[in-house]
From Swiss-Prot:
Superkingdom of source: Eukaryota
Pfam short name (any one): 2-Hacid_dh
Subunit structure: Homo- or heterodimer. Heterodimer with CTBP2. Interacts with ELK3 (via its PXDLS motif). Interacts with RBBP8 (via its PXDLS motif). Interacts with PNN, MECOM and ZFHX1B. Interacts with ZNF366 (via PXDLS motif). Interaction with SATB1 (non-acetylated form); the interaction stabilizes its attachment to DNA and promotes transcription repression. Interacts with PRDM16; the interaction represses white adipose tissue (WAT)-specific genes expression. Interacts with GLIS2, HIPK2, FOXP1, FOXP2, HDAC4, HDAC5, HDAC9, NRIP1, WIZ and ZNF217.
Gene name of the record: Ctbp1
Cysteine disulfide links: none
Species, as recorded: Mus musculus (Mouse)
Protein name: C-terminal-binding protein 1
Region (Interaction with GLIS2 2): 288-360
Amino acid sequence: MGSSHLLNKGLPLGVRPPIMNGPMHPRPLVALLDGRDCTVEMPILKDVATVAFCDAQSTQEIHEKVLNEAVGALMYHTITLTREDLEKFKALRIIVRIGSGFDNIDIKSAGDLGIAVCNVPAASVEETADSTLCHILNLYRRTTWLHQALREGTRVQSVEQIREVASGAARIRGETLGIIGLGRVGQAVALRAKAFGFNVLFYDPYLSDGIERALGLQRVSTLQDLLFHSDCVTLHCGLNEHNHHLINDFTVKQMRQGAFLVNTARGGLVDEKALAQALKEGRIRGAALDVHESEPFSFSQGPLKDAPNLICTPHAAWYSEQASIEMREEAAREIRRAITGRIPDSLKNCVNKDHLTAATHWASMDPAVVHPELNGAAYSRYPPGVVSVAPTGIPAAVEGIVPSAMSLSHGLPPVAHPPHAPSPGQTVKPEADRDHTSDQL
């Protein structure tokens, strides 16, 4: 019998037992898989769940207690869950991606196993759009390279020296920016770009007609048209099996000679080997990438290590302190809706609803009538936000989850490339929930 049939102790595939909550049951376990700061999530979940962290980068690093007992999981983009990984979780009912993108989760397999997958689609729209414009401005005005020249001791005084060090700087007004994917982030980028004087084109075959008139943009019907007419191309679509390596050796040759390329969406959209070659040959004048095929990114290895005129940042376009707190709060609220309501009906942003084979109603729970000693609390209640500490010195919320050999001196701290490239005029199918649900984060 396969492992997937053993997950639920005899229940059919895709049907998982409900979370048992209420006065006669312990609080269910919710785990943050790839982080260790739960201070934002705790106030939202502490009366309905025990919250723990794993700080793992793979399921091999997740403690057996979480694999056996966790009913909910929170995760960022730094861990990947394949079907094999998902089958290790015996009681999991919901995963919430703290961010918009969810290409690091096999959502179909999760649905087959009865696990709902949710995201935070409006997360970091402003931050990602701002970061995109920052990259575009850097490419046009060469700010990064000018700074680097001064840091390296280059003397810049005469007009000739300025011309030399600022070679390649260009005027923005009148240039054409091509946006691939006009979801939330794409629209925010378009509005900012227009304010800087760009003519803005976009390609999005799955967006309804009319948005271009409302925003004052020009729509093109094929990817080839956008690449041919754009001085700078920026990507704002999700990643799936249809658009992996959307920018490849073939599509690079369809771009204008000397165009710029910006990617703050998903690393797999760009064939980095083809990009490196295009940068070396000058077919692409400059590129700025916040996301990469292999993360964490390093200039010391991979095809981009010797590429000229390249700006790289570490998948941070989404980040601001405000955005981080907002997305964590919303992710925690989604977990709470799952525990106290019905899956998937009570969920706000379930991305694999069509794949779920069953929806189990979980009894609602009134925390006001739950006695602490019967609500999974083996220790007395503390003021809001305080986590008690077990005799071992490990916070009670994580005791038995973090291996005893690990010293904790503190509490919870504040697709394969398709065999052929897209042909001219071919539409490229994005995923159903792209960055209108995006990743950029």
